[in-house]
């Protein structure tokens, strides 16, 4: 796991949405540093949202970003439940269809970028439509 820089002395508490947005920006920058290209953020389709859509070569990468202050209760990566995976798969399916694609025609994968405290973990191909 890599360490993420933090800012100390923050004058106010962020809302849950602001915190999520902050970590999504961190994840985007971190993935761009690893060579992925940004496509979209906060993509909403019927009943679901994908935090980031990136490209790695010819592969479309759907990214779920998670943050937990500590590893208590399993940390950030453990919070991507089966139910959440199903919702992400459905949202990606709809997004692909809107862009004239499908899981059969587009090379894609589902990654998780999990921030636990100041540590970042990138789980490539964390789950798929055959899970």
UniProtKB/Swiss-Prot annotation:
CDD domains in the cross-refs: PoNe_Nuclease (cd20736)
Residue ranges of the region described as Disordered: 1-20
InterPro entries cross-referenced by the UniProt entry: Restrct_endonuc-II-like, tRNA_endonuc-like_dom_sf, UPF0102_YraN-like
Superkingdom field: Bacteria
MF term (GO), any: nucleic acid binding
One protein family per Pfam: UPF0102
Entry-linked Gene3D superfamilies: 3.40.1350.10
Family statement drawn from the similarity comment of this UniProt entry: Belongs to the UPF0102 family.
NCBIfam families in the record: PRK12497.1-3, YraN family protein
Protein name, UniProt field: UPF0102 protein YraN
Protein species of origin: Escherichia coli O139:H28 (strain E24377A / ETEC)
């Amino acid at each position: 796991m890599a360490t993420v820089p933090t800012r100390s002395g923050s004058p106010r508490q962020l809302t849950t949405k602001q915190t999520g947005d902050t970590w999504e920006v961190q994840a985007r920058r971190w993935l761009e540093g690893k060579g992925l290209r940004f496509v979209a953020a906060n993509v909403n389709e019927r009943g679901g949202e994908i935090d980031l859509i990136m490209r790695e070569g010819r592969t479309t990468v759907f990214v779920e970003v998670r943050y937990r202050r500590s590893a208590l209760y399993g940390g950030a990566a453990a919070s991507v439940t089966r139910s959440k995976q199903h919702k992400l798969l459905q949202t990606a399916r709809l997004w692909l269809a809107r862009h004239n694609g499908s899981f059969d025609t587009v090379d894609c994968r589902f990654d998780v970028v999990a921030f636990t405290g100041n540590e970042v973990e990138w789980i490539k191909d964390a789950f798929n439509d055959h899970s």
